[in-house]
Amino acid sequence: MSIENTLPTYPSLALALSQQAVALTPAEMHGLISGMLCGGSKDNGWQTLVHDLTNEGVAFPQALSLPLQQLHEATQEALENEGFMFQLLIPEGEDVTVFDRADALSGWVNHFLLGLGMLQPKLAQVKDEVGEAIDDLRNIAQLGYDEDEDQEELAQSLEEVVEYVRVAAILCHIEFTQQKPTAPEMHKPTLH
């Protein structure tokens, strides 16, 4: 199955957000929407929540609502794809420094946790592998770096962290959106 919807480009979404004076980066917005989807958001209530969290409850004009709808649909489709097609929307390219990518990743993770926590308010009680992944995400959200570090080494480490975050998000999506099997009902025989 191929992904029919594609994510808006980072620069085009950055422009749409800045034109509407929304103080989030595309990475942060994608993290927020991804967190809500991974937390179990199934309906159009995500838009109201995004408006409340980012725009004082005011709906966005069509110039921003359409790219955000596209972002939501492509992200949802990627998360639900069994081929693990989900990717983080963080800046890429020759003109993007490793420090810019690290900052974007930190913002993505912070907003992912916000979106996830809005739909799963008892995150601190989640155990096992998913609980560990959430704890790791909290640590990654506070990601720091030394600008004197070897940028090539930092870039390699960053790619590993991005991959870990991607897998952790998929793990959360599986945990919070898929129906858990329930024990079969025990029917007592009827005595006549």
From Swiss-Prot:
It holds the Pfam family UPF0149. InterPro entries: YgfB-like (IPR011978), YgfB-like_sf (IPR036255). One of its GO terms (cellular component) is cytosol. Signal peptide: none annotated. HAMAP family: UPF0149. Belongs to the UPF0149 family. This is UPF0149 protein YPO0911/y3298/YP_3608.
